A protein has these predicted regions:
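Short helix-loop-beta junction
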Residues: 63, 104-109, 163-165
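Catalytic cysteine-centered active loop of the rhodanese-like fold, especially the PTP/DSP P-loop
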Residues: 126-180
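Bacterial N-terminal signal peptides
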Residues: 6-15
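Flexible, polar/low-complexity N-terminal or interdomain linker segments that lie immediately upstream
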Residues: 18-92, 98-103
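Positively charged n-region of N-terminal signal peptides that target proteins for export
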Residues: 1-4
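Mid-length scaffold segments of soluble, non-membrane domains
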Residues: 74-139
């Protein structure tokens, strides 16, 4: 895994710095686990096949988001996302706006754009009592957006916790679609 990360980082740097094409063609199937390019996760709705393909490195000028944007949130990687897809107590949430999601997403994730999350806390297991949310029985939320420079998930996390969602029930896949 360390070698894969180092190789991917090197490809991104060389592509960004020198404008050269990466040595792995876009669309090439990538290994998820050692000698495994496909993982099948059993969910309540049936099996979901997980694959990864090479994408062009992100070249946006965004600001790198903190690994822990709100105290108490858990940073995670691809393995935890895959495990969460099979966990009935968890939800994998794509917090990007709909225009980004239609270009591709993590199979089995639900769409909950960051601008809508506060109005949709009920879908995450919270109940509304008057004007306040009670999130004591909330699901574990495994959330992602476009990648390390994307502010959409961190914005949603701040709004969620401000409304009473427990930070320790939020798992942040900061690598997002850039790493996926």
């Amino acid at each position: 895994m360390k070698h894969l990360f180092a190789m991917a980082a090197g490809l991104c740097v060389s592509t960004f710095a020198f404008g050269q094409a990466a040595s792995i063609p876009v669309g090439t199937a990538l290994t998820i686990f050692e000698n495994q390019k496909v993982v099948v996760v059993q969910t309540a709705k049936g099996p979901i096949e997980i694959t990864r393909t090479m994408t062009a490195c992100g070249k946006n000028g965004g600001v790198i988001q903190p690994l822990v944007p709100v105290p108490g949130i858990h940073p995670i990687g691809e393995t935890e996302i895959i495990q969460a897809l099979g966990n009935p107590k968890a939800m994998v949430v794509d917090m990007r706006d709909t225009n980004d999601r239609v270009k591709g997403t993590i199979p089995g994730s639900i769409s909950m754009p960051y601008t809508e999350v506060v109005d949709r806390l009920g879908e995450l297991g919270c109940t509304k009592t008057g004007s306040a949310w009670n999130c004591a029985e909330a699901k574990l939320v495994y959330a992602f957006c476009n990648g390390p420079t994307c502010p959409q998930s961190p914005i949603a996390f701040r709004a969620m916790t401000r409304e009473g969602f427990p930070a320790d029930k939020i798992y942040y896949y900061r690598g997002g679609m850039l790493d996926w």
